[in-house]
Amino acid sequence: YTTLFRSKDLRDTLESNSTSVPNSVNYINADKNLQIEFDEALQQASATSSKTSENPATIEEVLGLSQAIYDTKNALNGEQRLATEKSKDLKLIKGLKDLNKAQLEDVTNKVNAANTLTELSQLTQSTLKLNDKMKLLRDKLKTLVNPVKASLNYRNADYNLKRQFNKALKEAKGILNKNSGPNVNINDIQHLLTQIDNAKDQLNGEQRLKEHQQKSEVYVIKELDILNNAQKAAIINQIRASKDIKIINQIVDNAIE
């Protein structure tokens, strides 16, 4: 009777541990050798509990196998490893310089909620890539804004094209704001980087300047009959030397007067 009772106890131990433990945080994240030791304890117990009544296990065997399950289960270190890795990753993430407050809060919450080392690793890698993308956006603004705004292609561009470029810059500055920037992802940032490049490429100031110079020259030659050829040539030289549409308009207006 005692042997039968112990065998039932072993089967109960198997039943209560064979599914719940392998699905637990403490098992999933444990060192591989500790997982193997636990698995082997279950396998040995399962084999023993299947013995026939003609060849039953001894009480000592049953007790030893039950104890092996408990011991190898208690030796699992997944929760400890997960906590250690979370602490390490949070420290790394906290030191990233280019994320804004909302992004940091979001990834911190995700790290704290992670249940596996694999998930943590993926989170950390994606966060490092996000930080790199934010740095790319920050560097782009530093190298792009002043040269573009000082260029003929921007200064003489259509108003709506300048507005489109400035709108993209404003959105980028908003994202880069440490305190008030929104929680954007890598795809959002890449989309904005593309928007900035497209808006810059669509600026048509140089083309407009050239067209305006040509039209103004034709106007001076054909319409300003009150001027002699030398006067016309002098005005045309001023128009060709000018790099600003507004100044060209002033030159023509002065010539008319």
Protein language model regions, located:
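Short, small-residue-biased leader/transition segments that mark boundaries at the very start
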Residues: Y1-L4
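Fold-core signature of tandem repeat domains
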Residues: S7-L14, V21, Y27, L34, ...
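Short, charged/polar, low-complexity loop and linker segments
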Residues: T19-P22, N146-L152, K178
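Extended intrinsically disordered, low-complexity coil regions enriched in Ser, Thr, Gly, Ala
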Residues: N55-L63, S180-I186
